[in-house]
């Protein structure tokens, strides 16, 4: 007589056979073999953002990440995410899905990439948790393309939760270091996707606007033989048997291009600053949007051109990127960015008067501190209702050696900064284009003339009057969106304490 265990084993085998036989959907789900470009099937993958009521009752294929999953009886709800868009998907026991298929779907790890075939169905009640609120996907086939590990270093729902909301109800939020240590996952959040799509828009609008204005895009060297501005805040690199430096600015080369008769130039590229500044707005590497332009009679021709370029960028962002702006504001609420046309321009002495009236003690030739910049921004907003303005005629003593002195007041200079929400985003000036005056100013600043010989020599053969400035891309993004740390708007930030990832 067989043992009880043997009897049980004998009973289990036919049950397994029955279960396998009942899994009529076994060909409709599973883990796909690795895609190694073995074939190119004639299959169109529909974008999640295009799943609307216009596609109701269509059978579509979608590739997306599993954002969340929730099993309930004989059905499983998935939220499928593709960049900043998501849609609800339903796997339910029926003609196309077996209970084994539902179980398989429910157990797919979050962040896995899957291919799904399903029917787009209009829903009676809006799905508030998804961007595609009017439809859901009724799944007929589901295949895992890339399986994520079960333990994630951070949860995306926590990463997009407003900090205030987390503090109020005790739910988790994700701190900055955790985000940056796991940047690839953090960049998947809808907020990060929106930030960097808008930042891409800034570059596009900058380039588009300037090309329409007759500017020429140039590329300048980042490995140079001497510190860009004769200063010490440079990174030194080994260059064969000599030392070289990473460029602090493309300015000297922009000016050389003006001397070479290009008249109007701009460039977009990395800028390196070896400054041990651990603040909310400083990076050791950032993207510079740089402009240089010859003018006819007055450097204000250039100031107006740069200010108008920034205004065109602001208008373009508000017209073309409302979805991204609203996505970011859900997590980081902020007042809409305001600006005037034409741009408000104040002289430095006017700013000093406003600050002194507010109780700040400052000398006439003293530079603005960060707190005073922010205070001035609030005062300007109260008085003029603008977040963007130009501050003109800085004291000569606080500007670099190549800055043109004001001919009427030797203590002032033909220089300017531009501000967004009380923080500087551009520093610029009319450059000295006379080699003799340039030499005098360099010596006044204690700069070794031999190290800037090539720069000074470029003005010896006729140089037009010109001016320009450099804009920090990450700062513009941060301040336009009302964010509080430039690391949020740098894809892989570099600061004195971070060199990875």
Swiss-Prot record:
Molecular functions (GO terms): aspartate-tRNA ligase activity; ATP binding; nucleic acid binding
One GO biological process term: aspartyl-tRNA aminoacylation
Modified residues (N6-acetyllysine): 74, 374
Record field: catalytic activity: tRNA(Asp) + L-aspartate + ATP = L-aspartyl-tRNA(Asp) + AMP + diphosphate
Keyword S-adenosyl-L-methionine attached: no
Annotated keywords: Acetylation, Aminoacyl-tRNA synthetase, ATP-binding, Cytoplasm, Ligase, Nucleotide-binding, Phosphoprotein, Protein biosynthesis
Short name of any one Pfam family annotated for the protein: tRNA_anti-codon
EC number assigned by the record: 6.1.1.12
Function of the molecule: Catalyzes the specific attachment of an amino acid to its cognate tRNA in a 2 step reaction: the amino acid (AA) is first activated by ATP to form AA-AMP and then transferred to the acceptor end of the tRNA.
Positions of ATP binding: 273-275, 281-283, 424, 472-475
Name recorded for this polypeptide: Aspartate--tRNA ligase, cytoplasmic
GO cellular component terms, semicolon-separated: aminoacyl-tRNA synthetase multienzyme complex; cytoplasm; cytosol; synapse
Record note on quaternary structure: Homodimer. Part of a multisubunit complex that groups tRNA ligases for Arg (RARS1), Asp (DARS1), Gln (QARS1), Ile (IARS1), Leu (LARS1), Lys (KARS1), Met (MARS1) the bifunctional ligase for Glu and Pro (EPRS1) and the auxiliary subunits AIMP1/p43, AIMP2/p38 and EEF1E1/p18.
Record Gene3D superfamilies: Bira Bifunctional Protein, Domain 2, Nucleic acid-binding proteins
Residues recorded with modification Phosphoserine: 249
CDD domains: AspRS_cyto_N (cd04320), AsxRS_core (cd00776)
Organism: Mus musculus (Mouse)
TM segment ranges: none
Phylogenetic lineage: Eukaryota, Metazoa, Chordata, Craniata, Vertebrata
Region (Aspartate): 251-254
Family according to the record: Belongs to the class-II aminoacyl-tRNA synthetase family. Type 2 subfamily.
SUPFAM superfamilies: Class II aaRS and biotin synthetases, Nucleic acid-binding proteins
PANTHER family noted in UniProt: ASPARTATE--TRNA LIGASE, CYTOPLASMIC, ASPARTYL-TRNA SYNTHETASE
Positions carrying Phosphothreonine: 52
Coiled coil: none
């Amino acid at each position: 007589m067989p043992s009880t265990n043997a009897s049980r084993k004998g009973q289990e085998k036919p049950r397994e056979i029955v279960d396998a036989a009942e899994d009529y959907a076994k060909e409709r789900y599973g883990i796909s073999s690795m895609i190694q470009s073995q074939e190119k099937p004639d299959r169109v993958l529909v974008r999640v953002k295009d799943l609307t009521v216009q596609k109701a009752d269509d059978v579509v294929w979608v590739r997306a990440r599993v954002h969340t999953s929730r099993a309930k009886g004989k059905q499983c709800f998935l939220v499928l995410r593709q960049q900043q868009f998501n849609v609800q998907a339903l796997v339910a026991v029926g003609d196309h899905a077996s209970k084994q298929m539902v179980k398989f779907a429910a157990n797919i790890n979050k962040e896995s990439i899957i291919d799904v075939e399903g029917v787009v169905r209009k829903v009676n009640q809006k799905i508030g948790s998804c961007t595609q609120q009017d439809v859901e996907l009724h799944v007929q086939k589901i295949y895992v393309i890339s399986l994520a590990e079960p333990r994630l270093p951070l949860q995306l729902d926590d990463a997009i939760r407003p900090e205030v909301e987390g503090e109020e109800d005790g739910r988790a939020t994700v701190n900055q270091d955790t985000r940056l240590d796991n940047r690839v996952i953090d960049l998947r959040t809808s907020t990060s996707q929106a930030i960097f799509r808008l930042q891409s828009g800034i570059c596009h609008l900058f380039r588009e606007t300037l090309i329409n204005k007759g500017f020429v895009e140039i590329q300048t060297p980042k490995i140079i033989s001497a510190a860009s501005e004769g200063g010490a805040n440079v990174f030194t690199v080994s260059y064969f048997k000599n030392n070289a430096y990473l460029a602090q600015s493309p300015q000297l080369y922009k000016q050389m291009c003006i001397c070479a008769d290009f008249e109007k130039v701009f460039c977009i590229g990395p800028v390196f600053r070896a400054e041990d500044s651990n603040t909310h707005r400083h990076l050791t590497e950032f993207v510079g949007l740089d402009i240089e332009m010859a003018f006819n009679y007055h450097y204000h021709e250039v100031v107006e051109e740069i200010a108008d370029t920034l205004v065109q960028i602001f208008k373009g962002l508000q017209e073309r990127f409302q979805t991204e702006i609203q996505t970011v504001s859900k997590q980081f609420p902020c007042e809409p960015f305001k600006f005037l046309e034409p741009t408000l321009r104040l002289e430095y002495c006017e700013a000093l008067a406003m600050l002194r009236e507010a109780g700040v003690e400052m000398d006439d030739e003293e530079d603005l501190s960060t707190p005073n910049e922010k205070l001035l921004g609030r005062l300007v907003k109260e008085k003029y209702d603008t977040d963007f303005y130009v501050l003109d005629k800085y004291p000569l003593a606080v500007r670099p050696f190549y800055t043109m002195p004001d001919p009427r007041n030797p203590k002032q200079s033909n220089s300017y900064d531009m501000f967004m929400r009380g923080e500087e985003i551009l520093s610029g000036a009319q450059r000295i284009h006379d080699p003799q005056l340039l030499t005098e100013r360099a010596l006044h600043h204690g700069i070794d003339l031999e190290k800037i010989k090539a720069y000074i020599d470029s003005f010896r053969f006729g140089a037009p009057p010109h001016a320009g400035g450099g804009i920090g891309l990450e700062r513009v993004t941060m301040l336009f969106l009302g964010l509080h740390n430039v690391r949020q708007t740098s894809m892989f930030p570099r600061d004195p304490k971070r060199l990875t990832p």
